[in-house]
Regions:
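Classical eukaryotic N-terminal signal peptides for Sec-dependent ER targeting/secretion
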Residues: 1-8
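Noncatalytic scaffold domains of N-terminal-nucleophile
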Residues: 19-49, 61-179
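Surface-exposed charged/polar residues within alpha-helices that form helix-capping/stabilizing sites
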Residues: 52-53
């Protein structure tokens, strides 16, 4: 019994090491950053800097997001490629309205499941020929990223498109540091 208590005591001594008493480890680079004035965050510092410049020039969050989206096509294509698609949610605080833009890739108007996958039902296609839906010409779509970013800017941006894209174009022309 005494031995069990010693083992249990040693275990409980280790708990602070396993579960620190603070939620945030300020020595770690991975912790929340909080701001009252706004911030721009992306997977690339140079793209984020462009977004910050847009905000400082009087642009809104959508202007900054559009600039960062196009910039990432140059700085980090896997994160911001113009050959893909996506979704964007935009919240307008003044009206408490939420808007969504769906700019996933689309198939041509004349395409249909029968032409693409034969007479199988969608369930059969997913069960029998799942790879066809991902790795064949039938899976190809027209990219929607450019449309989506431009649509967001047109509907919700405050700066001109020229003002939003100037730093992005400059970045693409002048090149980036590759590490």
């Amino acid at each position: 019994m005494q031995f069990s208590r010693i083992i249990l005591f040693i275990f409980f001594l280790q708990i602070p090491e396993i579960y620190p008493d603070k939620y945030l480890d300020y020595k770690s680079p991975f912790h929340p950053t909080i701001s009252d004035t706004g911030m721009v965050v992306s997977q690339n510092l140079e793209s984020s800097k462009i977004g910050s410049q847009i905000l400082q020039a009087g642009g809104n969050a959508v202007d900054a997001a559009v600039a960062v989206g196009f910039s990432l096509a140059t700085t980090l294509p896997r994160a911001g490629n113009v050959g893909g698609g996506g979704f964007m949610l935009i919240y307008i605080k003044e009206n408490q309205e939420l808007f969504s833009i769906d700019y996933r890739g689309t198939s041509s108007l004349n395409s249909n499941l029968k032409d693409l996958f034969g007479s199988k039902s969608p369930a059969q296609i997913l069960e029998d020929d799942y790879d066809l839906t991902k790795y064949s010409y039938s899976a190809s779509t027209v990219p929607g990223t450019v449309y989506g970013l431009l649509e967001a800017h047109e509907k919700f941006g405050e700066l001109s498109l020229k003002e939003v894209l100037e730093p992005v174009i400059s970045q693409a022309k002048n090149g980036i540091i590759v590490t």
